[in-house]
Amino acid sequence: MSPSHSITSGRAAVRLSVRGVVQGVGFRPFVYSLAQRHALTGWVRNTSAGVEILAEGAPADVDAFVEALPREAPPRSHIAAFERSGAEPEGAMAFRILGSAVDPDAYQLVSPDIATCDDCRAELFDPRDRRYQYPFTNCTNCGPRFTIIEDLPYDRERTTMRRFPLCPACRAEYEDPTDRRFHAEPNACPVCGPRVRLVRRAEGGAEDGPGGGVVELAEGKPDDPAAPIGAAAELLRRGEILAVKGLGGFHLACDATDGDVVDRLKERKRRPHKALAVMFADLEQLRAHCRVSCAEEELLASPEHPIVLLPWRDVGPDGAVGPELGGGAGEGETCGPAGGAGPAAVIDPEVATGQRYLGAMLPYTPLHILLLREAGRPLVMTSGNLAEEPIVKGWEEIERLAPIADAYLVHDREIAVCYDDSVGLVRGGRPRLIRRSRGYAPFPVALPRPLPQTLACGAELKNAFCLTRDANAFLSQHIGDLENLETLEHYETSVAVYEKMFRLEPEVVGYDLHPEYLATKFALALPQDEKVAVQHHHAHIAARLVECGREDAVIGVSMDGLGYGDDGRLWGGEVFVCDLLGYRRVAYLEELPLPGGAAAIEKPWRTALGWSYALLGEDGLGRAARLLRSRAAAPVLADEDFAVVRRQIDAGLNAPLTTSCGRLFDAVAALAGVRHEITYEGQVAIELEMRSPAGGEPYPYALEGEVEVAACAPRRGAGEWVAAHAAHAAHAGEAGARETAPAVIRLAPLFAAVLGDLEAGAAAGAVGAGLHATVAAFVLDVCRRVRAATGLSVVAMAGGVFQNRLLADGCEAVLAADGFEVLAAGLVPVNDGGVALGQAAVAGYTSLKRRGELG
């Protein structure tokens, strides 16, 4: 065997190339210290591809160094590749950190932003420390990363910190190998670093920038860097709404215990019912309002610090949160004692109207830590934007917040990339993300195999895009709903940033079938010749497969609001047999009309009435109308409202057919009187879930037709058995798959039973419990039949409907009890935020197939 290093005059040398997340996480200082410990000389440097090391010394010391390096690497690093080769000793007298080597064609992984570490937090409150109450304290273990990086390699001159030259004290730390700020690129202090200011808009607006168009209320200075934060806390205590510039953009903040200001914020933000997130000073304060399991505490306090959905704690009659709802189901035993809270500390229930769960987070920057400490109460901390617009990140955009904010807590560190807060929960002891953004992106998802460079443009709602290089899928941060120019511009800018950062020139473009999606139009306007249309629900399942590292065929259960089908109709309750190349539709929910199209989504009473009529005729129409009237909130429904729905269905005018499971929940919830009109996506279904206990009895349904897919049973090689999709039609013929009509889940028995229960006086929660159990029952029924026909026993569940904890838990439980392996949601959102990952995989695999490279 050849030696793993070169030996000259008794000295050995080795060259190491390390790829992965190895910049911005203290990797070079770690290598330096490790080399010192093993008495080695040489050097370490950043490159455009990662970190390069040359180490020389006694052969045994070199070997020990190489062995220890991956084992002891910094906790926030991630080594994706570690290459070792021999080298000639250079005779270096010391070990040094060299300047970066820039290769314009190379790329590397980039660290997401990291929440403030314990050491920096301790300094923040130590009056003897020179960073006492400094809002931008950070070190190699924490602080801003991706949101300040403008290019790679990761050096200060290629970040937004370049405009803040280091003072002598910070420079000494930066150059001291024994200091934890050794080569910490965002390093700063009150003397040389960014400063915070509290301002109000003057008459004439903020368009003149931070030096004009504003009234100065307080300014941070070297001897009192946190003065504006104390003044801001006083405004919050007085009931004002503040725009607070944070890590990846602005938050809108107010006192979460003041119902008047909470209502005012919701009104100004045009968000009357959707829940707001709350930031707590610490776990003790949080425990006074929520029940928290140990797994949830771990997620809250993780380096990512996401918003975590937690069940309310009973805070007594005066502060009760929805007396009908009570506390939500907890995730295991609570961790730690309940915190104390006097009456003034009770969070206003309208923060999360009608919800069992509160979106809670802990402060993750020094600025937030200081603000929460000064405020002395929990603060609403919601995205700094108007409803459906991207988050504001800079002063040049702050005019958009003028209708909402009374004052602005700002700073002069620029934000390179706009990032919203991530949102997650814990189910089954595992973190599950609903929104993947700060703290998680741009860390890549590993692909089962390398793919051609691919851009996947994502969905219309909850958009994120995805770019691939090698076996890395860079799923972007949450972009938002692509329904206005501002969000589209944010989307286009973010795509360009990722392409630049990861040195990408996509060869393949994946996009949704829906011709009117802005993401689809963006894709079709791109110059690339190789474009792949990917069916929405197939993309959902493909995302689950990629996250779980699977290529083989599975049973895919994809249920959501709406997605464009191969037949041009609106799908949303689908069961596939599929892999990463293609799929076959084997069952779906019965097609039913949406009277008024989009109006039926905004006014779910229309769906309730239309489906009752379509399924049960005149009798169903009359019974549904009486229920809707008897349980109606404002506005009261008139005879003409019902007549219009009937005419639309009879004539087939503006009543597109859909198989949507999301609309099924809407219809039943509206019949049960939960809500007849919505102000945000999925509202009525979410509120039905909140009222529904576990353990309901299934309603009847009918499964019409046989699941006959034996002829397309999986064979060796990804995609060799798939049919259905037009893009794979020729290949389907090669596989010998015969066309069979999918089975249909008929809903007339369910609607008849629901109407009967409601007429007998059943509560909405009881009916909701039955509906959840019914969906779990027919999912199991169909999966059993597919297993019997194909032998497949792995089920991938995806789609926005599975954000519903009660439904997801129910489906996973019955499937697991019947011997199925379930690929459930994880750190890739189960909703449309994960669609781009699936699109990227399907488009990339399709490209490999076309090239004859898919083995």
Residue map of PLM features:
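Active-site-adjacent structural elements in enzyme catalytic cores
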Residues: 101-510, 514-527, 569
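Intrinsically disordered, low-complexity, mixed-charge
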Residues: 1-197, 815
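A contiguous, well-structured pocket-lining segment that forms one wall/lid of small-molecule binding clefts
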Residues: 193-195, 459-489, 493-497, 613-793, ...
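Conserved phosphate-binding/catalytic loops in two-lobed NTP-binding clefts
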Residues: 512, 528-540, 793-795, 811-835
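Glycine-rich phosphate-binding loop of actin/hexokinase-like ATP-binding domains
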Residues: 421-445, 452, 553-613, 642-695
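Conserved phosphate/anionic-ligand binding catalytic regions in large, soluble enzymes, centered on
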Residues: 241-256, 379-390, 560-570, 652-675, ...
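Glycine-rich phosphate-binding/hydrolytic loop that grips phosphoryl groups
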Residues: 537-559, 563-565, 604-610, 773, ...
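Glycine-rich phosphate-binding loops at beta-strand->alpha-helix junctions
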Residues: 512-517, 794-810
